[in-house]
Design a protein with these regions (language model features):
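Class I S-adenosyl-L-methionine-dependent methyltransferase catalytic core
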Residues: 1-203
Length: 203
């Protein structure tokens, strides 16, 4: 995958359980609305953030393999599939949220998407290293980000990307798993800090 030059980018859910919708920003399913459950703690990645992220990634992900490790609404994974990803593995431990992901997958006839109802950390630890071109990491803000990074980082191919959403700005030097990684893009939208990382070029 191409390297990006380091740069600084500009840049409440209810307990009702009733459905609402996100929309796909670009690609084959552009402007398609997808129902998502309005569950406590479920934070779909905002349209503005997704648009910025996929601009960073070059709009299309043709032929690439992607992992959405804490899928939630599936906003990132469905967006990647819409933009040509050959395989998207979405992992979600919440049964109802995983059920909604499967319903949306069937609605789109998205055969490149695999839904795993499982604990993200445990499943990631069982996957082969270097399996993915892009790993999307958007854990709950109260989760241990260090543990998530420890299992996610080895899954990224040598020239791949790691995307991280968090409740505060990410400092790679503060996380041992990110040793040798470079923060190439970052931004903030509301309470969401978002970051794109790639391994440092040793050439």
């Amino acid at each position: 995958m191409p390297r990006l030059a380091p740069s600084r980018a500009a840049g409440a859910s209810s307990k009702s359980g009733k459905p609402h919708a996100i929309r796909i920003i670009g690609g084959d399913w552009k402007r398609t609305p997808l129902p998502v459950l309005d569950l406590d703690g479920l934070r779909p990645t905002p349209d503005r953030v997704r648009e910025t992220l996929f601009n960073w990634l070059g709009q299309r992900l043709d032929g690439q393999h992607c992992l959405d490790l804490f899928a939630g609404s599936g906003a990132l994974g469905f967006e990647a599939a819409s933009r040509g990803a050959a395989r998207v593995l979405m992992v979600e431990r919440h049964a109802r949220a995983a059920g909604q992901l499967r319903a949306n997958q069937q609605r789109l006839d998205a055969r490149m998407i695999e839904i795993a109802e499982a604990d993200g950390l445990r499943l990631a630890a069982s996957l082969a290293p270097g399996s993915f071109d892009v790993v999307f990491l958007d854990p709950p803000f109260d989760a241990d980000l260090g543990k998530a990074l420890a299992v996610a980082v080895p899954l990224v191919r040598a020239d791949g990307y790691l995307y991280v959403e968090a409740g505060e700005a990410l400092e790679p030097a503060a996380h041992e798993p990110l040793s040798g990684w470079e923060l190439v893009r970052q931004g903030k939208a509301g309470a969401v800090h978002f970051h794109l990382l790639q391994r440092e070029n040793k050439e």
